[in-house]
């Protein structure tokens, strides 16, 4: 069985964990503390496959092409969704451990292949039901809609995750805690999530007989569609058999148009993550009667008074084939700037995830604040908001301070001076832009 020191995955394991090809022998652990943080270690593999998808998309004349604004927003949502786990253990795992410690009535052996495979099936079925309820209950949809807000379908879309989703998903895995040790669950909850990364692509078409058993890119494309035939279909994580068993399966047929039935039209990360909650609150107060108010929360997002629990499929906007994703024009120079700043941020973020156990509490707090400020500021730049210049100026000043005091270090020591020079020039530029915007605003007011 896997040993305590095996907290870092090998390159082979790194790729295999993305396709649920790890064996029980190499991924069984006696305690939760021994379980590798597979998701945190997956970042380089995510980036590698995303770059491969981009290259293959360029080589194909009709291949999918990445939009920088959508790409950065998806990665930003994924980064934000992982930040709470810097401060605390995941809610899913914490709840599971509590139930295990207080209520389990049977302790299956952690080093048994039978336990491993039972956990594989149990977690996957639990995910199916959580995912289904996340589409059928408006209060859960408020979190899950983040993942569906992209109007594109590529590997970066897989990383567009919700901050709040974990606060409800634990419920659907709790029965497993009555007999399956937490260390086994901690492995499979990560593997289930990682598998779902590679199926977010248009490059893989049909996988033959595997389509009967596994959730594949074709099946999951349907799930992300806003075509009427795609709504509330294909909830599977790894095994598509659950959808076939419970009547929610639909094969890919007409060209899929991706995204929400009512697109959000923004790339600002706080709006992407949380804008549905104020909308839900507004709907709650607009409808009359306590029954209708409760229905706003506990029925589907398409429900209105007098309609079925999940809404009327006839109310779904029809697909014309002329739908265009939200993609406002912005200069190539600004795109290059945002890309460069984002990848500087990504290096800090990845180091924060991997080194959090050896960093001081103050360092973790400062770097987390820096990541949040950066995600916000870059979102403002992409959205071309009026106060983006001032926020970016403040962010650049913070970067210089963190770098000067050793909280941020470049990937290579030789890059220290170029990085400082770039940030200094950026600070000056955004300061001048801020002054110009304030001056122009004052002139208009006068």
From Swiss-Prot:
Cofactor: Fe cation
Segments traversing the membrane: 39-59, 103-123, 167-187, 329-349, 362-382, 410-430
Fatty acid hydroxylase domain ranges (all copies): 117-248
Entry GO CC: endoplasmic reticulum; endoplasmic reticulum membrane
InterPro entries: AGMP_C (IPR056853), Fatty_acid_hydroxylase (IPR006694), Sterol_desaturase/TMEM195 (IPR051689)
UniProt motif (Histidine box-3) ranges: 220-224
Enzyme class: oxidoreductase
Membrane topology, record value: Multi-pass membrane protein
GO molecular function annotation: glyceryl-ether monooxygenase activity; iron ion binding
Family under the similarity heading: Belongs to the sterol desaturase family. TMEM195 subfamily.
Function: Glyceryl-ether monooxygenase that cleaves the O-alkyl bond of ether lipids. Ether lipids are essential components of brain membranes.
Protein name: Alkylglycerol monooxygenase
Native organism: Danio rerio (Zebrafish)
